[in-house]
Amino acid sequence: MTSSLDDIEPTAYNNMEADEEYCRRNDIHDLSSVVGDAVSQGVPDMDGQTTDSSKDPEPNSEDKKAFPPSSGSFFSPNLQGQRKKVLLKFVFTNCLLAIICFTMFVLFWGALYDTSKYLHKVKLLVVIQEPPVVILDNNSSMVVPSISYALPTFINKIPCDWDIYNSPTFQAKFDVNTPQQVNDKVVDLVYDEKYWFAINIKPNATETLFESLINDTAPLFNSTLFNQVVYETGRDPTNLKSTILPVAQTIEEYYHTFYTLNYLPPLLTNITQVYRYALTNNARYIAAAGKYNYEYYDHRPFTDRILLAPTQIGVVYCLLLTFFQFLLYGPLHVEMAKVLRPANGLIYRIAMSWFTFFFASLFFCTTTAIFQVDFTKSFGRGGFVVYWMSTWLFMLAAGGANENAVMLVITLGPQYLGFWILSFVILNIAPSFFPLALNNNVYRYGYMMPVHNVIDIYRVIFFDVTRRKMGRNYGILVALIALNTALLPFVGKYASRKLKQKALVAAKQS
């Protein structure tokens, strides 16, 4: 007797459906792993064509239970749990963004805020080679104050860290004798970065002014021959002229006003009425005597704008390259960790990073060379090699820190990687792009940051500033490389253990 579908009892039919569902659930994880491996490459269909399994995904029973049926409204009673989840995530995300703004951004903004109150930390030099009182005629009958006698009064009104010398004290301290040796030593002190700038008042300014006023054959008085400000833009191309050099310009402005209103008129009166000298009839001489300006001598000038790329913002891009290389190698590192012993895996990781940075640093430096930057100012024809090797050390130091930090951040969640890289960039550039002398002492942590040290090295290469800090700069970079390399196996073990624990918890909950 033939049975139809209607003859089957409902209970038996329900049991068949339950068995089918049970089997499908047991195979769901194995199936998902297979599909997961195939998604990136596509799944071949029966005709041998590659299809994308993500185009028409089949909803499984787990998805159906995890999410309630769509009600069409965010405020549906069925979505009460989801609304709570969204609210908590919203609050957490905004709190995290607030923390970043009120820590990292505050750190960067603070490096630029109210820098004038830190002028007392800026070391400046003043050398006055002319005595405060000058004898103007051969008979020693005309004694007048020198042009620069009041300069210390104006200098002390500006709260910088001043070192003021007259000619005898400067010669004794620095073992120099002649005025030319004094001038050369002033330049050397600025070059060695003992001072941010120096005001050098040279001798015989008052006598030259007097001769120009009474003698038609004397040269015109030119104050810039006797007043010189020595500085180096190459020491800080973006900040020195805007934040520190204005101090010298302010002193020049103050003293010019004092000279034209308070010094020159009484001097002219003394010359004509007290000492009975006749002033020159040449108006050009009188007009020239009314000007009192400084000569600004930039010992290491910044003349090529393209150098801002490798010595400032380009360093940030180089830092980001060290972050990207780790992300690109991430899947390969996971695969190799499964087939290599721990010791061999560690050697593999270090070798991959070091060789990658070796070539990446070459590519970065070649980009600078493409724009015809002069590498010969400090190290001659070997300048490019010095630049390349310095960049390699920088990438090793920064890349090692990134690699260790990224592994730790991933244990919290890969969604936080952006916060790390943003924080790492700001921690590096805040004490590196702006002079530490004009910042709070908290920014002195920058001395141990890779960006700060490599920028110092780059300024030697491109501007030929002093090399006296290069030993410290290279030493810190090498120390950072050694530290990050030593921490790598411990950080790797910790991150691996945490990820395994997360995987076990997830497996138990599934």
Curated annotation (Swiss-Prot):
Q: Which UniProt keywords apply?
A: Endoplasmic reticulum, Membrane, Transmembrane, Transmembrane helix
Please list the residue ranges that the record marks as compositionally biased, kind Low complexity: 67-76
Q: What is its main location?
A: endoplasmic reticulum
Q: Which residues lie on this side of the membrane: Lumenal?
A: 1-89, 145-312, 371-381, 438-474
Q: Mind telling me which residue stretches traverse the membrane in this protein? A: 90-110, 124-144, 313-333, 350-370, 382-402, 417-437, 475-495
Please give the name of this protein. Answer: Uncharacterized endoplasmic reticulum membrane protein YJR015W
Which ranges make up the Cytoplasmic topological domains here? Answer: 111-123, 334-349, 403-416, 496-510
Q: Which GO terms describe its cellular component?
A: cytoplasm; endoplasmic reticulum; endoplasmic reticulum membrane; membrane
Misc. remarks from the entry: Present with 639 molecules/cell in log phase SD medium.
Q: Which Pfam families match?
A: DUF3533
Q: Which family does it belong to?
A: To yeast SNG1.
Q: Where in the cell is it found?
A: Endoplasmic reticulum membrane
Q: Where is the composition biased (Basic and acidic residues)?
A: 53-66
Q: Record's superkingdom?
A: Eukaryota
Question: How does the record say this protein sits in the membrane?
Answer: Multi-pass membrane protein
Q: Where is this region: Disordered?
A: 38-76
